[in-house]
From Swiss-Prot:
Its main location: mitochondrion. It comes from Oryza sativa subsp. japonica (Rice). It is found in: Mitochondrion matrix. The gene is ETFB. The electron transfer flavoprotein serves as a specific electron acceptor for several dehydrogenases, including five acyl-CoA dehydrogenases, glutaryl-CoA and sarcosine dehydrogenase. It transfers the electrons to the main mitochondrial respiratory chain via ETF-ubiquinone oxidoreductase (ETF dehydrogenase). Disulfide bonds: none annotated. PANTHER family: ELECTRON TRANSFER FLAVOPROTEIN BETA-SUBUNIT, ELECTRON TRANSFER FLAVOPROTEIN SUBUNIT BETA. The keyword GTP-binding does not apply. This is Electron transfer flavoprotein subunit beta, mitochondrial.
């Protein structure tokens, strides 16, 4: 069985995000980029399923500019068998919406015919948490979201997911779509030999037009601004002063 894994290139989680001077979006020039952490978990889970014998091939896919190939090479270095790059140069004022990404992944799924599609539950740049659900809807496949455990056999996938007050266990007929939670696994580090091998591997390149997918966005970003800076804290000398400030400044009493 083949597993298709979607990955995304994002600003590294350790980088302090800054807004562009023209306020059209987040500054990405000369900024460290990396694979979305939830996507790393998705790749790791696919590799573990292949190593257990439940799957035979892992195909990584991404949508983005030419630089996104680095993210695919990370997936290849981790152990993915093949990679597909859907080339798309982003427009900050017309970002690629989750529905457009889901349509692209649907087209890839119809081409690759996987038994399972695994995605991170969300990306840390936009936190939409929509693509996996939309993809399942477009494919009319069952879905298991926020997976914290996945057990796969030839015909079904058993998924444990954390819900309010406990753990829910669901059974999905294959093919299916699964989105990963942070608790699912701990991604492996790519070894230096595998990193070097990944650099020489051929990545298949296609465009949304090749897949006959319309990715035009109806949403326009008007402006992006940084959150207001927090005021410095004040040390109060007495309870009376605290009550006075709550009453006259905060006006909560």
């Amino acid at each position: 069985m083949k597993i298709l894994v979607a990955v995304k290139r994002v600003v590294d989680y350790a980088v302090k995000v800054r807004v562009r001077p023209d306020r059209t979006g987040v500054e990405t020039a000369s900024v460290k980029m990396s694979m979305n952490p939830f996507c790393e978990i998705a790749v790791e889970e696919a590799l573990r399923l292949r190593e257990s014998g439940a799957a035979t091939e892992v195909v990584a896919a991404t949508v983005g500019p030419s630089q996104s190939a680095d993210t695919l090479r990370t997936a290849l270095a981790m152990g993915a068998d093949r990679a597909v790059h859907v080339l798309h140069d982003p427009d900050p004022s017309r970002p690629l919406l989750p529905l457009a990404v889901a349509k692209i992944l649907r087209a890839l799924a119809l081409q690759e015919n996987p038994g399972l599609v695994i995605l991170g539950k969300q990306a840390i740049d936009d936190d939409c948490n929509q693509t996996g659900q939309m993809l399942a809807g477009l494919l009319n496949w069952p879905q298991g979201t926020f997976a914290s455990k996945v057990i796969l056999n030839k015909e079904k996938a058993t998924v444990e997911r954390e819900v309010d007050g406990g753990i829910e266990t669901i059974s999905l007929d294959l093919p299916a779509v699964i989105t990963t939670d942070l608790r699912l696994n701990q991604p492996r580090y790519a070894t230096l030999p595998n990193i070097m091998k990944a650099k020489s591997k051929v990545i298949k390149k296609v465009t949304p037009e090749d897949l006959d997918v319309d990715i035009r966005s109806d949403m326009e970003v008007v402006e992006v601004t940084e959150p207001p800076k927090r005021k410095a804290g004040v040390i109060l000398s007495s309870v009376d002063e605290l009550v006075d400030r709550l009453k006259n400044e905060a006006r909560v009493l």
